[in-house]
Amino acid sequence: MEKLSYKTLENVGYDGYLLKDAKEKVLQFGEGNFLRAFVDYWFDLANEKADWNGKCCLVQPIAPGLAEMINEQDGLYTLHLRGSVNGEKVDDKRIISSVSRCLNPYQEEGFNEMMKVAASDDLEIIVSNTTEAGIHYDPSCQFEDKPAASFPGKLTQVLYHRYKNNKPGILMLACELIDNNGKELLKCVNQYIEQWNLEEGFKKYVNEECTFCGSLVDRIVPGRIRDPQEVARLEEENHYADPLTDVGEVFGLWVIEGDEKLNDVLPFKKAGLIDKVFVTPDMSPYKKRKVRILNGAHTGFVLGAYLAGQNIVRDCMHDEVIKGFMNKMLYDEVIPTLTLDKNDLLNFAKAVSDRFNNPFVDHELMSISLNSTSKWKARVMPSFLGYIDEHHALPKCITTSFAFYIQFYRGYELTDAGLVAKRPVGNTYTISDDRDILEFYYNHKDDSVKDLVHAVCTNTSFWGQDLTQIAGFEDAVVQTLTEIEEKGTYEVMKECL
């Protein structure tokens, strides 16, 4: 069967939206599943809805990559956005035509083409998602390298070439999942300017004429379809083969931190995507919303749900007690501590239920349980402390989630793989966390409930503070943990409702 290309689509009589030729307005570092299901999708919608008439030229950030495959398909690929919307199963298919080509800068021709795009009058935006490890300063990179090994090194080379060609400053959108991604990237570029002794005029160009924006990205992207039968079925339906087929969830949100005038460059407001992709002077409330509601919900209920016999998130959403516990925690104890518009928070929480109920994604509770100690501190504890400040009382569900956390970590055997514990339904499971945390729980495996709770609550290396100083908390956790031993986590959840 013919691979996806403009010619193939013409041959099969495809009549959906396509943009074959347009200016390369975006240089994108990263060609993986996430960016193609997220950034390139939004630009594709902007082309259709706002007549933006722009293409994204992709760059492989590391030597092994997809450039050859992408170019073989004229930059085209099929995107499936799958999930649940208001409880209804959704599978939206779209051919994305916002990508012009993909360059491999580790080949001479690819490097030269990257520099040509850098100096182009058409270029307006640079986007990156080079993984959490991508934004780092590597002093071994040299200006003469073709290319510099690190992404910030490559970006410095690109910006310098643009500067030397007297082209205007650029808008830089960092999508990496680290705090202050835009600022951290700019910091790395400035380090290379110093290391490579580049002129003061270029430093001024980077820091004053270019705009480095942080951004918050939110979409789960499972990536390619692995089931050969489904691949065969889709090829039959589409009348073409597409090894670059990508899958993401329906929900998507891109919050870009910066001045309102960025909307003069970005096409998303004009395209009517303002609730999905928008500019805000401060993205921290949106980050807090995601961490506390989406991630906090996961950490708050999954350990108790796993001990109650569940294995995947979706099944938890079909259990009235577990879902009820999650909702009570979110609506009564988490949302009241957040400062964004109330309707905005409620809509986000409602979307979380749909996302957790995704019929296409088997999200395992055990995968979410990884590093639950630091997750509880980062995702749940701020809501816990905020609730206490406001109400001068303990939040019942969050306090219960802390007891679930301790119960989950009550292992009996320490191995190289982790701390082994036994589930009430009979099977064993292995807890994954920092070694010192696992050793702590192993060393306290024979403690009484009272002693264990005291040891956990007073471990300031876990929580950054002594939790026994919070009035009534230690006693409440002891009581809840005792009830868990007697009745199990499911009954304890039920009693919270």
Give short role names for the model-derived ranges.
Residues M1-L497:
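Substrate/ligand-engaging "lid" and interaction regions
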